[in-house]
Amino acid sequence: MNLNATILGQAIAFVLFVIFCMKYVWPPIMAAIEKRQQEIADGLSSAERAKKDLDLAQANATDQLKKAKAEAQVIIEQASKRKAQILDEAKAEAEQERNKIVAQAQAEIDAERKRAREELRKQVAMLAIAGAEKIIERSVDEAANSDIVDKLVAEL
């Protein structure tokens, strides 16, 4: 019986140990395990949210980059058009200035040519009068001389 009393005592001690463990040891261990499980679940959900946020940020960055490239292309095209417009305006202005200078030079040439012709006509008339004076050996008075020169200039 001794053996049976020992087994019974050990069984009672084991049951008391199990009750003690279930009442005082098991709840803190389970609380720590549940807390750790909750932290892991929170960490996983946080990581999942961070991944979604990262994907969204990358998509936004890609969209903004595309928009910036499109805007840059539009600005480049506008600058090219403006450059061509400025060049065309400068060419037109230079052409007008050239035409103006050429016309002014042509007018000056024509005026100089006309003045030279008039001067030449007067000199020819004077030479003709001088020749005529020598031929007739007399001098014509200044009024008559002036009339003759004017008539010769008009005829030439």
UniProtKB/Swiss-Prot annotation:
It is found in: Cell inner membrane. GO terms for molecular function: proton-transporting ATP synthase activity, rotational mechanism; proton-transporting ATPase activity, rotational mechanism. It is a single-pass membrane protein. The keyword Ion transport applies. The keyword Nucleotidyltransferase does not apply. Keywords: ATP synthesis, Cell inner membrane, Cell membrane, CF(0), Hydrogen ion transport, Ion transport, Membrane, Transmembrane, Transmembrane helix, Transport. One of its GO terms (cellular component) is proton-transporting ATP synthase complex. The chain crosses the membrane at residues 11-31. It comes from the Bacteria. InterPro entries: ATP_synth_B-like_membr_sf (IPR028987), ATP_synth_b/b'su_bac/chlpt (IPR002146), ATP_synth_F0_bsu_bac (IPR005864), ATP_synthase_B_chain (IPR050059). Belongs to the ATPase B chain family. F-type ATPases have 2 components, F(1) - the catalytic core - and F(0) - the membrane proton channel. F(1) has five subunits: alpha(3), beta(3), gamma(1), delta(1), epsilon(1). F(0) has three main subunits: a(1), b(2) and c(10-14). The alpha and beta chains form an alternating ring which encloses part of the gamma chain. F(1) is attached to F(0) by a central stalk formed by the gamma and epsilon chains, while a peripheral stalk is formed by the delta and b chains. F(1)F(0) ATP synthase produces ATP from ADP in the presence of a proton or sodium gradient. F-type ATPases consist of two structural domains, F(1) containing the extramembraneous catalytic core and F(0) containing the membrane proton channel, linked together by a central stalk and a peripheral stalk. During catalysis, ATP synthesis in the catalytic domain of F(1) is coupled via a rotary mechanism of the central stalk subunits to proton translocation. Component of the F(0) channel, it forms part of the peripheral stalk, linking F(1) to F(0). This is ATP synthase subunit b. It comes from Yersinia pestis (strain Pestoides F).
